[in-house]
């Protein structure tokens, strides 16, 4: 059966988190009548990520570039579903995610969207960090964490921009939103189907790290600072 939804999961040494991510997706898939495929894009993995993905019935794609845009695009290029969904391996989607994505896209009023993101744990530092980016979220008018759209719209905007080594998701969301506006479709956010994400960045760097290092945050949000991106994403869990 040709899948209706292709879920793309970038994975760099994700043996710890990948099983829960896949299990959550399977639970969501059980609530729809359509088939799905899960594509795990292996990126420089030397742990059990590949074995775990295969054991869970996922398709495997390889992309070793230290560039999340290229990693996500590699998964999309291999996808066969008419709907593209992508989320990170350390996140767990809501059981009704796929059902709501299909419902909204069938209505034809939205071009795609994101989801509300909730941390797996709370602290004052994590809350303050979240509050600090609210103005940015308000300015962009998009949501992040988990992205969903029809394949035709993904391809129409050229997927993720490979010039970005960080905040590629923000750029993608803004371009997809602008693309939808041309045909009278808006950006959608899954408010009642939130994404639960790990706090491993806070665990590693500290709950107050982002607020105490505003210059670093500016470099990350610039999108093209290789050193900052490697420090925070690509060279993490590489030992």
Residue ranges of each PLM-predicted region?
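Short, well-formed alpha-helical segments that are part of the catalytic scaffolds
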Residues: 14-29
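Glycine-rich, basic loop-to-helix element that forms the pyrophosphate-binding segment
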Residues: 63-79
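A short, conserved alpha-helix in the catalytic core of glycosyltransferases
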Residues: 153-157, 164-184
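Cell-envelope/extracellular polymer assembly enzymes that use nucleotide-activated donors
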Residues: 4-6, 37, 171
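Conserved donor NDP-sugar-binding/catalytic core segment of glycosyltransferases
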Residues: 95-124
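Short beta-strand/loop segment that forms part of the nucleotide-sugar
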Residues: 34-44, 61
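Short aromatic/hydrophobic "clamp" motif used to bind/position activated sugar donors
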Residues: 84
């Amino acid at each position: 059966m040709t899948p209706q939804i292709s879920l793309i999961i970038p994975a760099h040494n994700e043996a710890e988190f990948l099983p829960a991510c896949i299990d959550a997706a399977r639970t969501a898939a059980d609530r729809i009548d359509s088939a799905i495929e899960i594509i795990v894009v292996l990126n420089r993995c030397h742990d059990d990520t590949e074995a775990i993905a295969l054991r869970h019935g996922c398709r495997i794609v390889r992309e070793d570039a230290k560039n999340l845009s290229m990693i996500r695009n590699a998964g999309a290029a291999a996808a066969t579903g008419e709907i593209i969904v992508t989320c990170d391996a350390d996140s767990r989607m809501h059981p009704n995610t796929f059902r709501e994505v299909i419902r909204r896209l069938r209505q034809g009023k939205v071009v795609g969207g994101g989801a509300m993101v909730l941390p797996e744990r709370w602290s004052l530092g994590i809350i303050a960090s979240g509050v600090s980016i609210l103005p940015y979220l308000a300015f962009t008018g998009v949501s992040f964490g988990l992205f969903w759209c029809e394949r035709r719209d993904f391809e129409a905007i050229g997927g993720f921009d490979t010039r970005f080594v960080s905040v590629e998701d923000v750029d993608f969301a803004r371009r997809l939103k602008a693309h939808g506006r041309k045909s009278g479709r808006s950006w959608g956010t899954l408010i009642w189907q939130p994404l639960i994400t790990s706090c491993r960045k806070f665990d590693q760097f500290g709950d107050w790290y982002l607020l105490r290092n505003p210059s670093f945050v500016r470099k990350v949000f610039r999108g093209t600072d290789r050193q900052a991106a490697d420090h925070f994403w690509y060279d993490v869990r590489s030992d």
